[in-house]
From Swiss-Prot:
Transmembrane segments: 10-29
Compartments reported by the entry: Cell membrane
Subunit structure: F-type ATPases have 2 components, F(1) - the catalytic core - and F(0) - the membrane proton channel. F(1) has five subunits: alpha(3), beta(3), gamma(1), delta(1), epsilon(1). F(0) has three main subunits: a(1), b(2) and c(10-14). The alpha and beta chains form an alternating ring which encloses part of the gamma chain. F(1) is attached to F(0) by a central stalk formed by the gamma and epsilon chains, while a peripheral stalk is formed by the delta and b chains.
HAMAP family found in the cross-reference section: ATP_synth_b_bprime (MF_01398)
Protein source organism: Desulforudis audaxviator (strain MP104C)
CDD domains: ATP-synt_Fo_b
Membrane topology: Single-pass membrane protein
Example GO molecular function: proton-transporting ATPase activity, rotational mechanism
Coiled-coil segments: none
Pfam families attached to this UniProt entry: ATP-synt_B (PF00430)
The name this protein goes by in its record: ATP synthase subunit b
UniProt similarity note: Belongs to the ATPase B chain family.
A Gene Ontology cellular-component term: proton-transporting ATP synthase complex
Length: 163
């Protein structure tokens, strides 16, 4: 059978157990809980700082990508302007060359025209001189038709020799 007698050691053990719980709570659990709370706060701060750095890095990346795209567009614009300027310069040079060639051609044609006029004038003078000589011989000699024919042939030969 079971003995249900009252034993004071049980109460003393319960008292010591409760006293030990109070002492542990005051001196062990509270500092341990403070350390755990500090560690949790530190970890939370580190996570928050990492998220901020990640957001800053993403913002910096998007900024750099935007700057790179802008730089590429500026480079394309510079290349386009340079290409356009070189095309315009090439067109200007070609137009200047055409103008100069046209001017030289016109000068050459004018010079040829002057030389032609000079040659024609000189030829007219020679023909006039020959005509005067022929007329003088015809008048002086009173030539026959055959003699006149021979005289004209000789004059033509002389003109051929002058050229």
């Amino acid at each position: 059978m079971v003995d249900l007698s009252f034993n004071a050691t049980v109460f003393m053990q319960m008292f010591h157990f409760l006293l030990m719980l109070v002492v542990l709570r005051l001196f062990a659990y509270r500092p341990l809980m403070n350390v755990i709370e500090q560690r949790q706060a530190y970890i939370a701060d580190e996570i928050e700082a990492a998220e901020k750095q990640k957001a800053a890095a993403a913002e910096l990346r998007s900024q750099l990508e935007a700057d790179l795209a802008k730089a590429r567009e500026e480079a394309k614009a510079i290349v386009a302007r340079a290409t356009k300027a070189s095309d315009e310069q090439a067109q200007a040079i070609m137009e200047q060359a055409r103008t100069e060639a046209q001017r030289l051609k016109e000068e050459a044609l004018a010079e040829i025209g002057r030389e032609r006029e000079k040659a024609i004038a000189q030829l007219k003078d020679e023909v006039a001189s020959l005509a005067v000589l022929v007329a003088a011989k015809v008048v002086k000699d009173g030539l026959t038709i055959d003699a006149q024919h021979n005289l004209v042939q000789n004059a033509i030969k002389e003109v051929g020799q002058l050229q």
